[in-house]
C-alpha cells in the first residue's frame, strides 16, 4: 500500500513507545492496532474484511490512510510531550531508522529506488536529526523549531508526492491528453 507520513512523524511515532508519561496500556493498545493494520496488509482474509468482503478494483488497501493517521496521532502525542525527550532518545531512534532504511536498500530488492531518492532521504534525516538535537538541547527556541520543522516537512512531502506521481506515471502509463 502507498503509505506516507514523513520521516519526522515516523520517528516521533516510534518515540511514542519510549515516552515515560504515556501509560503502558496506551502503548500496548497502539501497538495492537498497528499489528492489526500490518496483518491486514498481508493477510487476504483481513484485507477482504476491510474491503467489505469483496475484492477491490484498482484501489488495493484503500484503508491504508488509517494507518498513516494512526502514526500521525502517535507523533502528535509524542510532540506534545517533547520536553521529556532526551538526546539519547533521538540518537537511538535515528540509529534504528538508519538501520531500517539500509536494511531495506540492501536486502529489499527495490529496483525502482534511485540514488537521488536515497540521498534526499539521508539529507532530510540529517536535517531532522540536527534540528531535533538543537531543540532538545534548547539551542533554538520552540517557535523557531516549529517553523523550521514545518518548512522541512512541507518540502519533504512535496518531493515525495512528486516522486510518487512520477512512479505511478511510469507504472500505469496515464493517457496522454495531447490530441
For every predicted segment, state its role:
Residues 5-37, 128-133:
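Hydrophobic, aromatic-rich transmembrane alpha-helices
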Residues 31-37, 41, 45, 54, ...:
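Contiguous transmembrane helix-bundle modules in multi-pass membrane proteins
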Residues 2-15, 68-75, 123:
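Hydrophobic alpha-helical transmembrane segments
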